[in-house]
Amino acid sequence: MEKTIGLEIIEVVEQAAIASARLMGKGEKNEADRVAVEAMRVRMNQVEMLGRIVIGEGERDEAPMLYIGEEVGIYRDADKRAGVPAGKLVEIDIAVDPCEGTNLCAYGQPGSMAVLAISEKGGLFAAPDFYMKKLAAPPAAKGKVDINKSATENLKILSECLDRAIDELVVVVMDRPRHKELIQEIRQAGARVRLISDGDVSAAISCGFAGTNTHALMGIGAAPEGVISAAAMRCLGGHFQGQLIYDPEVVKTGLIGESRESNIARLQEMGITDPDRVYDANELASGQEVLFAACGITPGLLMEGVRFFKGGARTQSLVISSQSRTARFVDTVHMFDDVKTVSLR
């Protein structure tokens, strides 16, 4: 899969990022998301595959494009599919977030990016549009920290695994009222907290790379983004755990479903019989081969944002593979017109 469509999925996230970046700082988050979705879908439909969106922009009746269950790729066309020799059709599941951190893009803040994860059919967990308690940590702490332990306990373990004093550790937490006690506990334990307004996929992935000064992600965020983060962390060999949150009282904000009971019923309809189960990266991204791709929209810890010049743009992308165990940073100059001078800055 990496050899057949690896480069093309980079182009998919690049096109989404360029489209969103044109609206960076204009305060139009919905429009930034819409153009990213459209650009991603157009390029995705040029890839020689039969893809199925398992995590996208919502249910079919809620989203016009990249909705859950939508087929994408050249072979979504039954006539073209019929001409493919037996056993040669590439069927994949796809999780997308065309503009991760729409507010970050809209207000020109760092950390917005276009992301997707792919695996063979059945290889990605079809997470409901609920919330998820998450714990991400570097590879050295894999299997040692645990989402069921307190933040204080996990910080002690992290300190030992990384051979760092606790006061040298940085934990990323989303700036939400629900995290007030978590933030207090982390600070009382001696670690430092980096609060983010949006974009916890970037924060989770940063835990997998040395030199980002990000040592853990803790707290509750969106479940679909949790699956995308898990796919990346599986490829990187990092630690990721997620637990679905179905009680509105826990997140102190709206959820699909009006009550704890209705949310449990919805999970059961989806075949999730144990709503309190803790999933690791291998369960959320269980496929034999998993690929993750991202392209910076605004500058972040890992990638530069889109930089426009007269007649073109420059992007920085990341593609991570579970099969080759590689993380490739791709620097691309896009020439829109007949450009006489190509900017390398």
UniProtKB/Swiss-Prot annotation:
Binding site for Mn(2+) 1: D33, E57
Functional pathway: Carbohydrate biosynthesis; Calvin cycle
SUPFAM superfamilies: Carbohydrate phosphatase
Binding, Mn(2+) 2: D97, E100, E225
Reaction(s) this enzyme catalyzes, per UniProt: beta-D-fructose 1,6-bisphosphate + H2O = beta-D-fructose 6-phosphate + phosphate; D-sedoheptulose 1,7-bisphosphate + H2O = D-sedoheptulose 7-phosphate + phosphate
Activity regulation description: Inhibited by AMP and slightly innibited by hydrogen peroxyde.
GO biological process: fructose 1,6-bisphosphate metabolic process; gluconeogenesis; glycerol metabolic process; reductive pentose-phosphate cycle
EC number(s) given by UniProt: 3.1.3.11, 3.1.3.37
Organism, scientific name: Synechococcus elongatus (strain ATCC 33912 / PCC 7942 / FACHB-805) (Anacystis nidulans R2)
TM region positions: none
Cofactor field: Mn(2+)
Positions of substrate binding: E100, G101, T102, Y131, R176, P177, R178, D198, G199, D200
Top EC category: hydrolase
MF terms in GO: fructose 1,6-bisphosphate 1-phosphatase activity; metal ion binding; sedoheptulose-bisphosphatase activity
Organism superkingdom: Bacteria
Gene Ontology CC terms: cytosol
Assigned protein family: Belongs to the FBPase class 2 family.
Protein name: D-fructose 1,6-bisphosphatase class 2/sedoheptulose 1,7-bisphosphatase
One of the Pfam families matching this protein, by short name: FBPase_glpX
Function: Catalyzes the hydrolysis of fructose 1,6-bisphosphate (Fru 1,6-P2) and sedoheptulose 1,7-bisphosphate (Sed 1,7-P2) to fructose 6-phosphate and sedoheptulose 7-phosphate, respectively.
